[in-house]
Regions:
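Non-Sec secretion/translocation targeting segments of pathogen effectors
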Residues: 1-43
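An exposed, glycine/acidic-rich loop-and-rim segment of catalytic or binding clefts
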Residues: 38-406
Length: 406
């Protein structure tokens, strides 16, 4: 059953008790996007700007960058290419507005060197599919195997949602991106109408809603792949995220995986392991622990299972804070799990320059990616498979809530 999207989330709400009120669903009517040059739109202290983000070489299309700014000066930059978050700026403890995400200055690096899927909308299916194969209604589908030396399909493949140019519509308090995936495009069945809606409120909460419909039963598992560094986006050097303090309050298990991060179907109780963040820990104190699952991934890159998940309630998945800036990040979702990733595979010499002019190195950011469990379609013990039935609606939500440490 789909839930209503609530743009009025407040920091003092207890996440597991939040009631989603239907009267708020898209109460702000869309404004026709007729802007050709940079445009300003203000509502209740909100400002939305649009400008060019460069030309996409493969298609010749133009990419655009939208910036939503709230009355506090917090903002989010969103590119039509990949429906991507290219920057999030929020106030620190001294009142300075700083960028806290990885990103690039124009579309070219996202198209030519999509290192780490930075900020992108991942789909049709996030994470890995073993062998790139799955069955729906006894029909077997073979996807591109673009990972692990051609043995797995990862993050929707090389032509996934994060490298498509989405259409954009300006809303009163956000942006709606839409993309139509054709039947069998990239190997996935169904003509899929996908939407990603970003809304920034005046409490510095960024709401992300994912919606999709299909004319055939298909696989849908969308997420966002933003890399956060709450010390500031300019901190690109190796291990620069390891002073972050992390709490994962509502997860008592992770999905156990093999050496290429395909789930075995077993659940690992995290008690007395380095994966237990039910009490907050500084990353540098646990990331190099002697545990097989941690060694396999060269740092944190695990799927955490969210306790008390019901598919409707926004549950507090993770909390992150920086002692340097005082910035806090709370992540909430109504998805069953999330991938916690500490950018262990960044730092390749071929990657492009960042928006600050340097290159992002290993462990210079962290990702919290709410989603269905990896390879769920092929794993008997995983209840939810990520199958979207023809004519039904996929409707899930992520909230990134920013604050200042008290």
């Amino acid at each position: 059953m789909p839930i209503d999207f609530n743009p009025h989330f407040y920091n003092n709400i207890q996440p597991q008790q939040q009631i989603i009120n239907p009267q708020y669903m898209f109460q702000n009517q869309p404004i026709k996007d007729t802007f050709i040059k940079s445009a300003d739109v203000k509502f209740d202290g909100m400002k939305i700007e649009k400008k060019s983000f460069g030309k996409i070489e493969k298609t010749g299309e133009k990419a655009y960058l939208y910036t939503i700014t709230n009355k506090n000066g917090a903002s989010v930059n969103l590119s039509t290419f990949g429906a991507t978050i290219t920057g999030i700026k929020v106030p620190d403890k001294d009142g300075n507005i700083i960028d806290v995400t990885h990103g690039y200055n124009d579309v070219t690096p996202y198209e030519k060197s999509p290192v780490g899927h930075a900020g992108g909308t991942i789909g049709p299916c996030a994470n890995k599919i073993d062998g790139g194969k799955f069955k729906i209604n006894d029909q077997e589908y073979q996807l591109e195997c673009n990972k692990d030396n051609g043995s797995t399909h990862s993050h929707g493949g090389s032509e996934g949602f994060d490298v498509q140019n989405w259409k954009a519509k300006i809303l009163r308090d956000g942006i709606e991106f839409s993309y139509i995936k054709k039947d069998m495009e990239n190997g996935y069945p169904g003509n899929v109408k996908a939407k990603v809606i970003y809304k920034l409120d005046n409490d510095n909460n960024l709401h992300i809603q994912y919606k999709a419909t299909s004319d055939k039963d298909t696989l849908i598992n969308m997420t966002n792949h933003t890399y956060f560094n709450l010390d500031g986006a300019e901190n690109t050097e190796e291990n620069s995220v390891l002073d972050h303090i992390v709490e994962i309050p509502n997860s008592s298990t992770i999905t156990k995986t093999n050496k290429i991060s395909i789930p075995t179907g077993e659940f690992l109780n995290i008690k007395d392991t380095p994966f237990d963040f039910r009490e907050e820990k500084k990353l540098k104190n646990v990331i190099n622990s002697d545990h097989e699952q941690l060694k396999n991934t060269k740092g944190f890159d695990q799927n955490y299972c969210i306790d008390n998940y019901d598919g409707k309630t926004l549950i507090e998945a993770a909390n992150v804070r920086s002692e340097k800036t005082g910035i806090t990040l709370k992540v909430l979702t109504n998805l069953p799990g999330f991938q916690f990733y500490t950018a262990n595979n960044l730092g390749k010499s071929s990657q492009p320059e960042s928006k600050s002019g340097s290159r992002y190195e290993k462990r210079s950011g962290l990702c919290i990616e709410p989603q269905f469990y990896p390879n769920a379609i092929n794993t008997e013990s995983f209840k939810e498979k990520g199958i979207l039935k023809a004519g039904e609606e996929y409707n899930r939500e992520i909230v990134y809530s920013f604050g200042i440490e008290e």
